[in-house]
Curated annotation (Swiss-Prot):
This is GPCR-type G protein COLD1. The gene is COLD1. The chain crosses the membrane at residues 7-27, 45-65, 82-102, 112-132, 153-173, 297-319, 345-365, 389-409, 437-457. Keywords: Cell membrane, Coiled coil, Endoplasmic reticulum, Lipoprotein, Membrane, Myristate, Stress response, Transmembrane, Transmembrane helix. Involved in chilling tolerance. Interacts with the G-protein alpha subunit GPA1 to activate the calcium channel for sensing low temperature and to accelerate G-protein GTPase activity. It holds the Pfam family GPHR_N. A lipid is attached at G2 (N-myristoyl glycine). The keyword Cell membrane applies. It is a multi-pass membrane protein. Interacts with GPA1/RGA1.
Amino acid sequence: MGWGAVVYGGGVVGASLVGLGWAGLWFLNRRLYKEYEERRALVQILFGLVFAFSCNLFQLVLFEILPVLSKHARFLNWHLDLFCLILLLVFVLPYYHCYLLLRNSGVRRERALLVAALFLLVFLYGFWRMGIHFPMPSPEKGFFTMPQLVSRIGVIGVSVMAVLSGFGAVNLPYSYLSLFIREIDEKDIKTLERQLMQSMETCIAKKKKIVLSKMEMERIQGSEEKLKARSFLKRIVGTVVRSVQEDQTEQDIKSLDAEVQALEELSKQLFLEIYELRQAKIAAAFSRTWRGHAQNLLGYALSVYCVYKMLKSLQSVVFKEAGSVDPVTMTITIFLRHFDIGIDVTLLSQYISLIFIGMLVVISVRGFLANVMKFFFAVSRVGSGSTTNVVLFLSEIMGMYFISSILLIRKSLANEYRVIITDVLGGDIQFDFYHRWFDAIFVASAFLSLLLISAQYTSRQTDKHPID
């Protein structure tokens, strides 16, 4: 391989990683950090690195199919990407996350560094012990090898994927089908808005009372100077009266504070309910358009596929099978078997594999980022101080999620591409186990989501008009 090929390969890899890292930083700052002020530079860099190396795994799968770059360059890129990503996930992120938690709690820098190092040792021990309960490669070459680390990361990542996929398999038809859309009366929304305004006005009035009560306490405390000029008896009586007044005022302030907190919580709930009703009203109006009807048909098709996927996963769990062929591939296979259309089947299967993997990549990345945003905004409501911790946690989950996606996507590839990924990840990895594990968690998550969404839908049906 000449120097020109080396420079070209390095340029393509470097440019793609820089582009992916920039995309990760854009997503973090524009979509996640939009309403939050705390922005640590190192946290952003770590998130961008994990995002770049994670997405590069999918890019490398496409490079193998197209193909792009030489075989040797792709092989080196695989190893470099996995090495850097595992280094970040297993060593850097746990250590730095613990260090930041300690520093934010007021621990001195030297002690935080030491405690974070001890935590990393405990984390590595727990990470190693986790592999005892799952099929793992032979430990002859040691713990810190690519197959050992990828296998353990895969268990966590596949579990996260299965939970998200199980919920999505139930929630997606529920979101798309007009059957589950309820009609919202505008007067219900107006009633809620009046209640929200009344709650906010009452809250403001009580806050004013708190301010006035505090001013009254300051006035009473300021009257001590005047009491010193009076007789001894008058000072005693004044002190007793002032003490009683202060106690009563303090009790009033505490009572008002509790009422204000309750009103603020009520206002928040009313605001969220108004928002949900507005969204439901928009969805109901959209369902009556031609695009809404098309989405409804798509919802029925997706419902059939999701039911099929749940049944096949249940079959895989019950009969301990290693996963089955998806209906799209099955249909194409049957068609080509019965109809000779004069097309090279090998070439066609390669292009179909490319399209299918591309769709899997786009859907997987899009679905993961959507869930990242939901999780981020849900957790970050507790305060801006937790934003950094949430971003680091999401970086950890993101890397594990994408590595696990490669473990599962591998089975959808043609044998020639499957062998390459097997060699890179390690031939000792029990790939079939991850498919069975995914199916088991997927079925449990899907049925639990079905119960929760059914309960939610039933409660909405029994309460057509939530406002009396």
